């Protein structure tokens, strides 16, 4: 019996037993490729002939190559080509083959047969062959004790018959007590006596494959229809059959699992080229697996960092989105040019103020100078020109976020400076022209250009001849200040800047409210100090007067975790509860 159990453990036990080998060969013919089994024994025969020094080994090697390994006539295509090609080259050149010339092919064939053996052990053919062999060995007994054993079997059979007769006689005596005792068995075992007659217990060992328990099965019982309740009822119905089988068959056993060679204990042959190559391939495979694992971990960490950096709310994105993206970005060269223009404007303003002539209330001018300055001297139409010159260009205002409101004083100061510079630059036409005449530079054009009132072209009339072209004008002052004001507009927060908020959560405070539908709305805003009710509503775009807001505060008497405080004043400071501002909308 122990020899038969070895069939399931290893391939060598099957190949060394004739009965198991015949069953294995029949299974290969039916379900797989039997030529690899023939090649295995042919290689063993060649190695034995080579060891004994028989001359027939050369003829056998040619037969093995032509029948199994040849690319044209061979039937073992699964063997790699680099194992078969050297053997064919040596046979074609008439070179004598070594004793271990088929060793690489033999190793490949053994691995193939081991995989087939694992499938063969789980087949019905293997179980039938195992039961057949077990029954024949159980019936075979030594010849000297045949008469004694037959006498013992006769005695056992007669004693068994008398015991069954006595049991039948006892069972026929029906009493009230016996019926009460057998009531449960009669109701739960209905029809089992007929089933026993149809399927009597066999006198052969019951062999099955090793499987897991019902609860640990890989197949779902609910999917297959075999629920635990149904399994329990089925077990109760057929329990007596299993008990009868166990009593009749004392040799019931479970087949052992297939033994697999451990990879950890594999020894590498570093003395041969193939052994070193296999060792290098194994090391490379492990290193590549480790590199892939490291790359995967790095990619996951990068994704987590990106998620942490992008932790900003929708309100921050809406407030930080710039409405006019056509203005472009300001690089360092533009900032340097702007600084030089402003510096030159300031210097030219100082120079033009020193060279400007006295007004009508000042000292009288000389006759020569007066004749030269009569063409561009301010007239009674100067107020109209001044009105056209200092006209502030209209610009569409876009909504800004809360950080822009903190700079309103600075914007007001910029607008005031713009008005003052425009008023100072209005009379620069006459002063500049007079200075040009005194310095003997190119004279200014004497033709007066009249533009319609309110036209923007009137502000662009300035002299562009000579070095004095850098003299200030309403157009240059207005354009430079307007350019600076656009830079202030572009300083509004953008989503890229808000993405850095997630790195420093200490600068944020969490505010939230619970709506009438019991859905919480949460956001994170910069912690700039105490917050008022108006700022809280502005963050969530809540309308005024629609609902009342109750804010969480610490309970005064300590009877509850918190209490709700109704706040109606828009300028009232909100309480902070557990590091956040929480409210309920009612």
UniProtKB/Swiss-Prot annotation:
User: Where do the segments described as Disordered lie?
Assistant: 137-168, 344-442, 478-501
What is the annotated localization of this protein? Cell membrane; Nucleus; Cytoplasm, Cell cortex
Domain (RGS) ranges: 10-131
- How is expression of this protein distributed across tissues? Expressed in hypodermal cells (seam cells) V5 and V6, Q neuroblasts, ventral hypodermal cells P7/8 to P11/12, body wall muscle cells and neurons in the head, the tail and the ventral nerve cord.
Keywords assigned by UniProt, alphabetized: Cell membrane, Cytoplasm, Developmental protein, Membrane, Nucleus, Wnt signaling pathway
* Residue spans of biased composition, Low complexity class: 421-442
Provide one Gene Ontology cellular component.
Answer: plasma membrane
GO function term, MF aspect, one: beta-catenin binding
The record's section on PROSITE patterns has: DIX, RGS
| Bias (Basic residues) ranges | 486-501
Principal cellular location given in the protein's record? membrane
What InterPro entries does the record tag this protein with? Axin-like, DIX, DIX_dom_sf, RGS, RGS_sf, RGS_subdomain_2, Ubiquitin-like_domsf
Q: Which residues form the DIX domain?
A: 505-586
**This protein's record includes keyword tRNA processing:** no
The source's superkingdom equals Eukaryota
Relate the assembly described in the record.
Interacts (via N-terminus) with apr-1 (via C-terminus). Interacts with bar-1 (via ARM repeats), gsk-3, and mig-5.
Q: Which PANTHER family match?
A: AXIN
> What is this protein for, i.e. what is its function?
Works in parallel with axl-1 in negatively regulating bar-1 signaling in vulval precursor cells and Q neuroblasts. Inhibits Wnt signaling, which affects tissue specific expression of Hox genes, egl-5, lin-39 and mab-5. This in turn affects QR (postembryonic neuroblast) cell migration, vulval cell fate specification, and the development of sensory structures by the seam cell lineage. Has a role in alae V cell patterning, ray formation in the male tail and axon guidance. Does not affect B cell polarity.
Q: What name does the UniProt record give this protein?
A: Axin-like protein pry-1
* Taxonomic placement: Eukaryota, Metazoa, Ecdysozoa, Nematoda, Chromadorea
